[in-house]
């Protein structure tokens, strides 16, 4: 039986951190075993909020760093097609065709667009950002994805893609595009090391998967804990405490975690001990990832590029067929095909 197609991916922001691992990578390791999986490196989406040259110039190195971390975590390029969004020109065509059957009013009702604009510090919403859901729908429908992993706060984007697929199918009287389904990961964003905000490279509150032991220890020892606990003998709060959130995710010794929580709530253990044990647990978790990353870094220089090239070539082959079929279906191919046929026939007769 043919496996279902899944599309997932990231903007190329560089090396991955623990928030990425908890939020997406851990699920992707399962997905690659169950589905025909595509990873999109969404560099075009980067332009919707960061179209400046400085940001664009970071994309090549960010792409390679991100793919290195994919491999280090166990993503298998033999099971997953990793492709570069901007290298699929057919995607631009599909995006344009879709934009003709979408209203501005519908796009303005998507709440995340305004949120993205505010987060990027934009005074006005540019056309590209307003049309972000159309491009995302083109990403999804280009691969004829059946499944798309998504957090519940971004489900409106997948609902829009479903809407667009249904509208296209209805307008052109054909069930050409499958209706994509959301796969909810149910993972909350991992809080950054200073509390409050989620882990983010831009907020400088992240622990990266490739942080070495010294840097990892330095970051953990500086972590935010319970602000009301000024001495070790004062009972502390473990709920919402970043130290214990990290212990729950990354410390495989569950008995130790429960013991630390119990003593912390009674004021019988200090922050230093709790942090040191977190460092040992997290370093043990990250060491195989760092080692695997070093292994791939030591390979020939263009190894990562070959993986991206192969994945992009496969994605483009699929995209080319989809766009050709779409043009045939809506009748857009007729004019050019007629002109081409007449011209080629004339040339052949003249030979």
From Swiss-Prot:
Tell me yes or no: is Aminoacyl-tRNA synthetase among this UniProt entry's keywords: yes
Could you provide one GO biological process annotation from this protein's UniProt record? tryptophanyl-tRNA aminoacylation
As recorded in UniProt, its EC number(s) are: 6.1.1.2
Motif 'KMSKS' region: chain residues: 198-202
Q: Name one GO cellular component term.
A: cytosol
Q: Which GO terms describe its molecular function?
A: ATP binding; tryptophan-tRNA ligase activity
**Motif, 'HIGH' region: chain positions:** 12-20
Report which reactions are catalysed by this protein: tRNA(Trp) + L-tryptophan + ATP = L-tryptophyl-tRNA(Trp) + AMP + diphosphate + H(+)
PANTHER family xrefs: TRYPTOPHAN--TRNA LIGASE, MITOCHONDRIAL
Descriptive protein name: Tryptophan--tRNA ligase
The organism named in the record is Borreliella burgdorferi (strain ATCC 35210 / DSM 4680 / CIP 102532 / B31) (Borrelia burgdorferi)
